[in-house]
Curated annotation (Swiss-Prot):
Catalytic-site annotation from UniProt: 126, 129
A single BP term in Gene Ontology: cell redox homeostasis
Superkingdom of the source species: Eukaryota
Protein name (Swiss-Prot/TrEMBL): Thioredoxin-like 1-2, chloroplastic
Protein purpose: Probable thiol-disulfide oxidoreductase that may participate in various redox reactions.
Region Disordered, annotated ranges: 242-279
Length: 279
């Protein structure tokens, strides 16, 4: 009976506890049982509150965290600053400016008087124009009395067609009553052509007539271009008055010698008498 009682197990709750042994072991077993029961109860409560109870959890690709606004702002400012900086606006001198319209070009040439004016036709996408731009700015700085007008081909393409500009970079020199002095195309490698033309036409000259500017054929072509808001009326041809016409005729007669009078021969007489203008 004693052996049977020793082998018997007393059931308390749902845990089997041997009837014999130290009390410390019994207390430890009871404590572990209580802790396991408390953990199970806590897990059950959390499971009831969780929205994923009894559902499948889909795991997708990892998403990057949004960047704070204070970090994005400097990047946007740098990009905006880079877009605003244009190569043809760098290094400009006080005597350099960009033409805004056909009327602006005509007025600028007319109001320049006897000063030398250089019209620079360029394009933002032209590599030769970009390479030549720093040297043109340097030349403009060395010649403050020369006016440099820049014409953007991309913004004034229709006007350039009317002015027969089909190659870039392209330059035209104008001065006073002489109008257009020369026109040519040059690159960074042929900058000597530009310097030679500047040295030839830079010396001051006094015009005796009004400032000419563009040719009349070019003005008519600009006026006929429907894409441009430019008006021009052909100047009437001046008819010389009577005194002016007589003076012009006298000038022509003084330069040309009149041929001598031919002798006249009387027919029907035996003697042939020569009648001259002096007899």
């Amino acid at each position: 009976m004693a052996a049977t009682a020793a082998q018997a197990v007393a059931v308390k709750g749902s845990v089997a506890v041997p009837p014999c042994g130290s009390r410390g072991r019994r207390r430890g077993a009871v404590a572990s049982v209580r802790m396991a029961a408390a953990a199970a109860t806590s897990a059950l409560r959390i499971g009831r509150r969780s929205p994923f109870l009894g559902r499948r959890l889909a795991v997708g690709p990892r998403r990057s965290r949004p960047v704070p606004r204070n970090l994005v702002a400097p990047v946007q400012m740098n990009l905006a600053f880079a877009k605003a900086t244009k190569w043809w606006e760098k290094g400009l001198q006080p005597n350099m400016r960009e033409v805004e319209s056909a009327q602006d070009l005509v007025d600028s040439l007319t109001n320049a008087g006897d000063n030398l004016v250089i019209v620079d036709f360029f394009s933002p996408g032209c590599g030769g124009c970009r390479a030549l731009h720093p040297k043109i700015c340097q030349i403009a700085e060395q010649n403050p009395d020369v006016l440099f007008l820049q014409v953007n081909y991309e913004e004034h393409k229709s006007m350039c067609y009317s002015l027969h500009v089909h190659v870039l970079p392209f330059f035209r020199f104008y001065r006073g009553a002489q109008g257009r002095l020369c026109s040519f195309s040059c690159t960074n490698a042929t900058i000597k052509k530009f310097r030679d033309a500047l040295a030839k036409h830079k010396p001051d000259r006094c015009s005796l007539g009004p400032t000419r500017g563009l040719e009349e054929s070019e003005l008519l072509a600009l006026a006929a271009n429907k894409d441009l808001q430019f008006n021009y009326t052909k100047k009437p041809e001046l008819v010389p008055s009577g005194d002016a016409a007589a003076a012009q005729e006298l000038d022509r007669g003084s330069t040309k010698l009149s041929p001598p009078a031919k002798p006249l021969v009387k027919q029907g007489s035996e003697e042939r008498s020569l009648v001259s203008s002096g007899r």
